Amino acid sequence: MKKIQLEILGLSSSQSQSGSFALVLGEKEGNRRLPIIIGMFEAQSIAIQIEKINPNRPLTHDLFKSFALEVGVKVREVLISDLKEGVFYSKIICSNGTQEFELDARPSDAIAIGLRFGVDIYTVESVLSEAGII
């Protein structure tokens, strides 16, 4: 399975779903874009991290990072792994120093967590072929 690296291109309110946001990812070495509709709270968490804003109290994704580091777990990468019936699936690839493991997550949560750990975001060709736009 060849992984394709993505980067965040933009985040805006969704034209099609009220109260939702469109997170637009793009191929790092290509022209295709991958739009994903996400919720308001996840969009806020992603935007806060992109803008390097420090909230007064930790958000859920900040808490996850603190907990993971406290117990010796590091996030290695985020993988948007599948698209089934219009729903994206992703994995957070982690390591505890002796073994690597995957956590199933919504892409919005995986990306919010991945941003906090400063890791790369990937997808696979089948997802980009089905949902990607040029």
Description of each model-found segment:
Residues 1-134:
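Divalent-cation
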